[in-house]
Amino acid sequence: MELPLVVENRLHDLAEWLIAWTTPSEPTPEQWNACRIFAHRGLHDDPRVPENTMASLAAVLYFEDIHGVEFDIRWTKDLVPMVFHDPDLQRVFGNSERLADLTSTELRQRFPLIPTLSEVVRRLGERKHLMIEIKEEHYPEPEHQLEVLQETLAGLVPGEHFHFLLLDPVTYEKLSTFPKASILLVGGFN
């Protein structure tokens, strides 16, 4: 069930207030030192570089203090995992088509800035930690899609080189062959 935006915003404000009000104390220096910085969708807020493109993701390589990068994957019609946040191309590219309705070849010909998961893994895989958000969407061939993820991430160590982020607990079952410690369920409004 999707909440009206005004209700979602109020609930978000309430949650932030409760967290701020109930937080017992400032983190200790040890806790601060244990924190890791992740770039959200690469250089998410840089108007010169569209989010989740190879340029925005690879930019983290220039920053030693950035531990890793968070990005989302969506599946094309021919079941290739692409690095993209939205189900359609409207917000980033001004096109209302859905990624799931295009083959990877069509997508790459018309929107060459959108990388495949494989390209991102090859470029960043062992150099920066990957936080891969698996979106809640229709999975027409879940066994095949799981195999594709396994093959794409085969050279990396789950939990050391990457984690999966899930907003939907149902998706957790689709990743059954990956170690549980490499799968993080995230709560909240996103």
Which residues are covered by each model-predicted region?
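Phosphate-group recognition and catalysis centered on beta-loop-alpha active-site segments
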Residues: M1-N190
